[in-house]
């Protein structure tokens, strides 16, 4: 009986990638905040993730299933979250202000406030720095493709 209760407690405390994740600009993405520990991240998003083998630092890919592309990437530095960004264009992801992935670029500039464009290879990132944090809006062919959160002035371009 104790073993069964312990198992229920473990399962209940295990998080998972949100089905319709939210960006709170300057604060969190998918329920994860910059500076959280690796353990806090796994508690929030669960233990199902892949590791990037070609990345400079430790990067985890939380996806909706094995061999699926959409989800959330978490970059860690010294065991803490240093950057977050969506993978591909996960359906249903949105901002606290109602901006949804798939929106046209004009909606981003209207709803996100003042942003600065950064040219990357094949796409543009509209960034806004505030309170030591950079919120990134990834735009491909005039359409909002993804969200990101990192330290202010960090390079938002991802490969």
Per-range role (PLM):
Residues 2-22:
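Bacterial Sec-dependent signal peptides at the C-terminal "C-region" and cleavage site
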Residues 9-11, 27, 49, 148:
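Generic low-complexity, intrinsically disordered sequence content enriched
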Residues 13-16, 28, 110, 135:
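Generic serine detector
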Residues 18-19, 25-28, 36:
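Long, compositionally biased, intrinsically disordered segments
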Residues 25-32, 92-99:
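Second-shell loop/turn segments in exported
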Residues 36-80, 99-159:
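A cross-family detector of function-defining hotspots
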Residues 82-86:
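Eukaryote-biased recognition of intrinsically disordered, low-complexity regulatory segments
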Residues 88-90:
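Extracellular beta-rich ligand/substrate-recognition surface
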């Amino acid at each position: 009986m104790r073993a069964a209760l312990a198992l229920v407690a473990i399962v209940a405390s295990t998080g998972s990638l949100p089905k319709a994740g939210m960006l709170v600009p300057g604060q969190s993405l998918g329920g994860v905040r910059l500076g959280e520990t690796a353990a806090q991240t796994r508690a929030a998003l669960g233990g199902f993730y892949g590791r990037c083998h070609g990345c400079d630092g430790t990067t985890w890919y939380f996806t909706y299933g094995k061999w699926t592309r959409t989800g959330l990437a978490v970059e860690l530095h010294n065991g803490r979250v240093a950057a977050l960004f969506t993978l591909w264009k996960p359906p249903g992801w949105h901002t606290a202000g109602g901006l949804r992935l798939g929106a046209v670029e004009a909606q981003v500039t209207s709803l996100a406030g003042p942003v600065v464009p950064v040219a990357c290879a094949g796409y543009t990132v509209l960034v806004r720095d505030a309170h030591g944090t950079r919120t990134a809006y990834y735009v491909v062919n005039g359409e909002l493709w993804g969200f990101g959160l990192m330290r202010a002035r960090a390079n938002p371009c991802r490969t």
